């Protein structure tokens, strides 16, 4: 975190570095190149059986109340939730285990921290693993992979149909759109 972002970013630019961000508001505010959040295509096949409906894993980061509210709402609708919320990062699970848990679920939960607009990795993970997504990030509607059949905006969409949303099949996203979020595409952006 920069103490004086405008001044600090200017100093970094003067060193010859190209700056980019995955947050569209930061890109506009600080005149930085906007780039998509990225992910590496899964190299191994993960289990296909589903053992839970909704999955969240992450630190609470001032989101605990919203996470608990969402979990209760989902469970009251008859959905099985797997929420892993460690107290510290050291108490968390490994990333391979995280991906395994994600693969065992129908839907990924993505609750952004306040003032965050850019995508977290969860929407891109959901995209690559063909999972539904429940998010509170209303800005997700502007992304090319957005499809209301796959992405439920918590706080905007009606909660009446959330169970049907989670249980309905994922609508396939075209491969050419997925490629835009692959790390190799991101790297190509920076190659001369």
Predicted regions and their residues:
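Catalytic core of nucleotide-activated saccharide and alditol-phosphate transferases
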Residues: 1-75, 181
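A generic structural motif
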Residues: 1-3, 81-88, 155, 177
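Acidic-and-aromatic substrate-binding clefts and catalytic sites of carbohydrate-active enzymes
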Residues: 3-5, 89-92, 116-119
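Hydrophobic beta-strand segments of well-ordered beta-sheets in folded domains
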Residues: 16-20, 52-55, 78-83, 107-108, ...
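Conserved beta-strand termini and adjacent loop/short-helix elements that scaffold enzyme active sites
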Residues: 22, 35-37, 84-86, 154-156
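Residue-level detector of flexible, active-site-proximal loop/helix-junction positions
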Residues: 26, 39, 61, 88, ...
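Catalytic donor nucleotide-activated moiety binding site of glycosyltransferases and closely related
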Residues: 58-99, 138
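Catalytic binding pocket for nucleotide-activated donors in carbohydrate/polymer assembly enzymes
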Residues: 96-192
